[in-house]
Amino acid sequence: MLASPALAGARAFAATVSGSLGIPIPAISAPSPSQARRRASLVVVAKVKVSTPQADRIARHVRLRKKVSGTTERPRLSVFRSNKHLYAQVIDDTKSCTLVSASTMHKSLSKDLEYSAGPTVEVAQKIGEVIAKSCLEKGITKVVFDRGGFLYHGRIKALADAARENGLDF
C-alpha cells in the first residue's frame, strides 16, 4: 500500500519523538480500504432551515400583499402591532400615499389610553374606532383589510371589529 505524504510525515514525527524522549509511540498505519469506506459512509450532512416568528410573519405578509392592494375607491387598512404599540393606517397604493392613520403613539390618543405592558384588546378597539371615524370624515367607507401577516386574533381582530362597528365596510 502506498503511503501518503501526510502519513509519511506523521511516521517521521513519531519516530523523532519516540527516539528523543524515549517514549514508545505505536506505529501509525493507513486505514485499509474497507475501513476508509466505512468511515466515509458514516458522514451525514443535514441542512436545516431555521425560521423565526418574525420571518414567518413577514413571509405571510408578502404572500398577502400579492393579493391585497388598495385603490382610490377601496384603500387598504394596514395594521401593525409591536410589543409596545399598535398602528393602523389607510393607504392608497395607486398613489402610494397614506390617507388616514391612528396609533397609540398619537398624543391625542396616548393621553386617553392607559396601559403598561403593551396595547390590550381595549386599546385596539379604541384605535379601530378612531381610524373608522377619521375615514368617515374623509369620505372613505369601503376598505380592504391588511392584517400585516399577523393572525386574525386578539388585538388585530378587536381593531377590525371596532372599525366595522363604527362604519367601515370590509
Swiss-Prot record:
The keyword ATP-binding appears for this protein: no
GO terms under cellular component: chloroplast; ribonucleoprotein complex; ribosome
Coiled-coil zones: none
Disulphide linkage map: none
Molecular function per GO: 5S rRNA binding; structural constituent of ribosome
Localization, UniProt: Plastid, Chloroplast
Gene3D superfamilies: 3.30.420.100
Keywords for this protein: Chloroplast, Plastid, Ribonucleoprotein, Ribosomal protein, RNA-binding, rRNA-binding, Transit peptide
Subunit annotation: Part of the 50S ribosomal subunit; contacts the 5S rRNA.
Function in brief: Binds 5S rRNA, forms part of the central protuberance of the 50S subunit.
Record-given protein name: Large ribosomal subunit protein uL18c
